[in-house]
C-alpha cells in the first residue's frame, strides 16, 4: 500500500528550505510513500532543484497561492486565506487524495482550520495535541501539548478519554491509567478548573489515579497524562531545553583538556547513544487527536532532520491504522459511559476497552 501524505511546505519558521529537503530525504528511504508538496510552486521547485529531486516520482507539487504566517490570527487563516498551503493540504486529506497532513504551521490556525475542514470525532469538542513521551519502561501519552491554551473541565475529561482510547487501541491495555497534571498530588491542589476536572475524572469510568506532578512525566507513573495546552506546551519545551543544555554541558566538559578529549574518544559509543536519546528533534511531530482524519503538528522551529521525523509520525500512524483504531475504541467506549451516571456537566466517551496490540513507538514515534 502506498502511503500518501500532504506536506504543508510553507508552514513553520523556515518554510520550503526545511520542509522540502526533509520530504526528499524521507521518500528516498521509504519507497512506499508518496508526498504531495503543497505551497508556492516556484519556491518548492527551487528547493527540489537544489536537492536534485525535480524528477522524483514519489513527490508531486500541489500549488497554493497563500501562506498562513506564524503570527496570523486564527480568523485570518480560517476566513481569508482559503487557498493557503495549510488549507489546501487539509482539503486533499478530506477529499481522500491523501491519508494524513503534516504541518509546522501556526498551531492555533492549524487546529481551527483542521476542525473546520476535517471535523471532529463524535463527542469531541476540541482536538488535542498528543504525543508518546519516553519513560524508563516505555511511553507515556501526554495531551494537550499546545492546541488549547484555555480549557474547561469537560475538555480535560475529553482529552483523558481520547488518551485512554489511543493507548487502549495501540497497546491493548484494557484499563490504561490516567493522571491529571497538577502542582501537587493532593485533591485540594490546583485552580478551580483542575479541581473540577478531577471531580469529573473520578466520577467517570476511566482508571483515574489522581493528580500527578511535573516530575512524574518521564517516570512512567501513569499511562496517560492530561493537561491544558498552555501547561503541556511549557512542560514539553522546558524538557527540550533541559535535554539540549545537558548535551551542551557534556560536550563542553569533554572538550576542556587533552585528557578529557582522550576520555571522550574512549566514551564515544556511550556519548553517541546518550546524544541520540536526548536529541529532542527525534521526538518532533505530534498527532492532533480527535479529528476525523490524521494531522501531524511539527514544531515551527524544526530543522530538516526534525521535520523528517514529523513526516515519519504521519507515515507510521497511517501504516498502523491509528485513526481507525482510535475511532473504533472511542465508539466502543461510548456505550459504557452512557450508563455510568456521570454528572450532566461531564462530556465525552471513555471506558475500559482493548485494542490491537502495537508498540506506541511503531505507531507514532519510530524511525527506520
Swiss-Prot record:
Keywords: Cytoplasm, Lipid biosynthesis, Lipid metabolism, Phospholipid biosynthesis, Phospholipid metabolism, Transferase
Residue ranges crossing the lipid bilayer per the database entry: none
Catalytic activity: a fatty acyl-[ACP] + phosphate = an acyl phosphate + holo-[ACP]
Source species, domain of life: Bacteria
Enzyme nomenclature, EC number: 2.3.1.274
Gene Ontology biological process terms in this record: fatty acid biosynthetic process; phospholipid biosynthetic process
Region annotated Disordered, chain positions: 334-368
GO CC aspect terms: cytoplasm
Pathway in which this enzyme or protein is active: Lipid metabolism; phospholipid metabolism
Principal place of residence: cytoplasm
Family matches, as Pfam families: FA_synthesis (PF02504)
GO MF term (any one): phosphate:acyl-[acyl carrier protein] acyltransferase activity
Annotated localization: Cytoplasm
Family, per entry: Belongs to the PlsX family.
Cited PANTHER family: FATTY ACID/PHOSPHOLIPID SYNTHESIS PROTEIN PLSX, PHOSPHATE ACYLTRANSFERASE
Assembly description: Homodimer. Probably interacts with PlsY.
Function, as annotated: Catalyzes the reversible formation of acyl-phosphate (acyl-PO(4)) from acyl-[acyl-carrier-protein] (acyl-ACP). This enzyme utilizes acyl-ACP as fatty acyl donor, but not acyl-CoA.
HAMAP family in UniProt: PlsX (MF_00019)
Name of the protein in its database record: Phosphate acyltransferase
Biological source species: Burkholderia mallei (strain ATCC 23344)
Gene field: plsX
